[in-house]
Curated annotation (Swiss-Prot):
It comes from Mus musculus. The lineage of its organism: Eukaryota, Metazoa, Chordata, Craniata, Vertebrata. Residues 1027-1060 form a coiled coil. It catalyses: a 1,2-diacyl-sn-glycero-3-phospho-(1D-myo-inositol-3,5-bisphosphate) + H2O = a 1,2-diacyl-sn-glycero-3-phospho-(1D-myo-inositol-5-phosphate) + phosphate; a 1,2-diacyl-sn-glycero-3-phospho-(1D-myo-inositol-3-phosphate) + H2O = a 1,2-diacyl-sn-glycero-3-phospho-(1D-myo-inositol) + phosphate; 1,2-dihexadecanoyl-sn-glycero-3-phospho-(1D-myo-inositol-3-phosphate) + H2O = 1,2-dihexadecanoyl-sn-glycero-3-phospho-(1D-myo-inositol) + phosphate; 1,2-dioctanoyl-sn-glycero-3-phospho-(1-D-myo-inositol-3-phosphate) + H2O = 1,2-dioctanoyl-sn-glycero-3-phospho-(1D-myo-inositol) + phosphate. A zinc finger (FYVE-type) spans 1117-1177. Transmembrane segments: none annotated. The gene is Mtmr3. It is found in: Cytoplasm, Cytosol; Membrane. This is Phosphatidylinositol-3,5-bisphosphate 3-phosphatase MTMR3. Forms heterodimers with MTMR4 that recruit both CEP55 and PLK1; occurs during early mitosis, regulates the phosphorylation of CEP55 by PLK1 and its recruitment to the midbody where it mediates cell abscission. The keyword Glycosyltransferase does not apply. Decreases the levels of phosphatidylinositol 3-phosphate, a phospholipid found in cell membranes where it acts as key regulator of both cell signaling and intracellular membrane traffic. Could also have a molecular sequestering/adapter activity and regulate biological processes independently of its phosphatase activity.
Amino acid sequence: MDEEMRHSLECIQANQIFPRKQLIREDENLQVPFLELHGESTEYVGRAEEAIIALSNYRLHIKFKESLVNVPLQLIESVECRDIFQLHLTCKDCKVIRCQFPTFEQCQDWLKRLNNAIRPPGKIEDLFSFAYHAWCMEVYASEKEQHGDLCRPGEHVTSRFKNEVERMGFDMNNAWRISNINEKYKLCGSYPQELIVPAWITDKELESVAGFRSWKRIPAVIYRHQSNGAVIARCGQPEVSWWGWRNADDEHLVQSVARACASDSQSSISKVSTRNSCRDFPNAGDLSDVEFDSSLSNTSGAESLALQPQKLLILDARSYAAAVANRAKGGGCECPEYYPNCEVVFMGMANIHSIRRSFQSLRLLCTQMPDPGNWLSALESTKWLHHLSVLLKSALLVVHAVDRDQRPVLVHCSDGWDRTPQIVALAKLLLDPYYRTIEGFQVLVEMEWLDFGHKFADRCGHGEDSDDLNERCPVFLQWLDCVHQLQRQFPCSFEFNEAFLVKLVQHTYSCLFGTFLCNNAKERGEKQTQERTCSVWSLLRAGNKAFKNLLYSSQSEAVLYPVCHVRNLMLWSAVYLPCPSPSTPTDDSCAPYPVPGTSPDEPPLSRLPKTRSFDNLTTTCENMVPLASRRSSDPSLNEKWQEHGRSLELSSFASAGEEVPAMDSLRKPSRLLGGAELSVAAGVAEGQMENILQEATKEESGVEEPTHRGHTEVPEVKEEAPLAKESSMAAEGPVVLYQEPQLDDATLRSHQGPSLSLFSQGIPEHQDGHNVLSSSLQAPLRGEDSQEVPVEQPQVENIAEDRENVAPAVPVDAKVGLGISQSSSLLPSQVPFETRGPHINNSVHMLLEDKVKSESGPQLHHRPCPASSGRFSGKDMLPVAPEPRSAERPQWDSVLHRTSSPGNTLSLLQAPCALPLDKCRQGIVCNGALETENKASEQPAGFDTLQKYPTPNGHCANWEAGRSKDSLSHQLSATSCSSAHLYSRNLHHKWLNSHSGRPSTTSSPDQPSRSHLDDDGMPVYTDTIQQRLRQIESGHQQEVETLKKQVQELKSRLESQYLTSSLRFNGDFGDEVTSIPDSESNLDQNCVSRCSTEIFSEASWEQVDKQDTEMTRWLPDHLAAHCYACDSAFWLASRKHHCRNCGNVFCSSCCNQKVPVPSQQLFEPSRVCKSCYSSLHPTSSSIDLELDKPIAATSN
């Protein structure tokens, strides 16, 4: 009880230990320009030269006009003032940041603040990782859930030593043993507590050897080749000194490693030969007694000494001159005369001081002008690639000795914690495919770098009072660079991708996690970092698809032999060069492709007039200036920019409720409003590579990429096979459609309002790839008196009251055609673009009114105009209502509260079509004729279609249904989480929302989007190759899902036919069922039997099972360590969710659907797993059964 109370007190006092600091603003109008992590508190917010600068206890954030800088404080190595007004920040990962200030005093103030912030901590608790963990635990404690294990690494890390001994197959009976001589670190503080040594070496001999080796780092075995039994061992240098000291126990131990290796290999060979002889020679009686005895020989420890061992290779990472010079300090190297049957090789690797100078030269080079004339020669002069080459050659020498020559290897340098882990970890990575997996790589880092005492605190500069700059050196970064070189040479051999390594580089220095704190395991145990901080492996876990290499093949080369020449190595641009820093799309960095047919006299497309704010757009609109040339660098358009790069990781049809046309897909060119062919989406700033990727996505999937960053793109309309059309209805909820009246030109002119004439006159005929409406729709709503609509917060109660009290202003047939999901029609964010105009209030009330009437009234459809684009085949298309951006939602919210006035009429803001209205109406009215049959099944689910309406200027208006970009928290609160226009989100936000649990904040002009940053507060890193691979994979999965649904539909229809024939044979049909054949052959719209919704299929008669009436028992939380569906481990971000139907525990991605569960008395949409969702979600019946009343089903 006392211990429980003590723990509860610790939980209560957790965030009192790390209190938030008071925010100091240089300007009262400034806001924090980023979303804070748990435990993060912003201390200063101010203005720099054309930038906003903010400083917290975790990061420095500088938001420029068209880019941003986001760097953890511990990643900054130094700050100095240059040119009086400029701060020069040097980072530990080779980056350099420059920030200009308007005044000298302001520059000096920020210089002092930054120098105080980056100073090495006086105590380790001052590092942010402790505050981050404490606040995370505080949040989880308030949720009354146990999440402490989510901050921990997996079992493969915590039990790594035992698992590795078993996996590598050490013979622990005769050749090797596990020594506990270093228990509680009483022998060596920088060594692990368990060591593998030859079986006949006693602990007393080990103590004697420890006195002879530097820092008592005795030779210990760390790897065994599973085929030939050769081992790799590591140690510190021998302390020979100028006196030439010897140690007999040390010489005996080194030779015993080779003998134990020979004994182990003989034992393994005998076991293999025994299995082969029993398998290949079942009648093995012909073998002689000598051969039989030798095949089963199991030599003891004494007999193994008589075996002839291979010559042991002692690899000294230093040069011979450096090794001899170390004798003056009491060190030295092994003398071949004293170590018989051993070979000593010197590799000539540079020490940490040379590596540090080389890295500083590289950093200076990377921060120069982007294209220096002597780039290659200057890069060669840094010798950075040369040092990488020597390191790779050293590791390759170990691989040759172990794999080809079957020789044991002993590796050391001076102290054994810098160059030694570089060589042995790289050699193990080349030798063993397990270490090239995500889990294996984590084990490799933990064992060779953390357990064997690499001095991360001193080398990275975040230790307590670690002011000695001579101790700092990017040793671990250099090793990760070598791993990156291997990834380039063997792209299919690594399970993790480059983003994994970039994240590891960032968090080596960031101190967000406690994995790389302190200098050794003993210090980490004393400071309790494992219990008081989060592990970086909780982020870089194996289940995180963002870090998986889609080219990985487990059947690739078992042993890698890389090319180590300098000419084959490449600079790691993702880490060293400043190019990957997040930036907003600018016209300088990416100009759209030229549009065919444009006039040469038009202004160039690469430079567009710049409008800075929402108010400027209003003023421009009032001055009748064309608005279609607005730049995408404006903050109000920036919100969704980063999702363009990140959404490429998903396919353009990654919506849960969407179908992919697997057959008969026809590629037809998109057309701009001006008639030009649209080849790529506008507004891409990462270069033309992403444009190419986007085009490739369209070619791969046959579906246009959804709208990004406020630009509208004309979608392609695809035809779908009948089965795909039929199955598409099973995934979508009912869609309520309305019909717009047929209006002639005179009627249009009579209803023309001032806003319509304004927009029709202000829109140019030719555009450069942007939709005409992308900027014109930015204007605020205005009433008849041209007053802006006040911004209010939406109230669901008021909406409901208005819906009940509103009388119909116009008949049903006069209402505009809008595609609104029935389950989401009450969401204020789902009000479509088409309703924008000075007389918008009536249309909103129509939507609310018809939400109630849609259950009983006949559904009316419109037919799109096929003549204007040449892409329609006369089939009905269902429009999907696009969602306004977040900056515009408050205005739409306020519209929902306005009352209807009888005198108001409905008007639309529309863009002109390329064809005149008279040509567009050849045989078919542009707004469509009244349809009597429900053709919803003919529309492929989840496809955005083109809508056309007549406009006062005599053109046909093109409307594209854009996909909604709601925040994830908004989606989860809605009842249509899986609808096609609500589901599009990138995979990275899953970790953010489950990890942080923070409320979302609205963006302001000074507040950039969170999408610029990753879930850990670091800049987003994107790999275009991996993005394209994810598109291909997602497309393949969608095709498989489509085929599965088609097969299920066919199976259901066959079962239905079988049941029908069986019932008819038995004569058991009732009156209701026997009326179905009449309705199937009756095409009369007024047929009563076709309106019946009581019988959807003959297969609806099911026997009631006893278990259907029982409540499902939930699986307890503490019994579920992995997701029931995908088997991914639960951790800090992967939360546990119960399925309300089956009771099993799933991760958020496997349990993200909502549907009513009547069997559990849950009549509101509740969270269920995917399998239960497919069984509970009502599927469409036979394609011939077309109902006027939509089947009541939720779209989530």
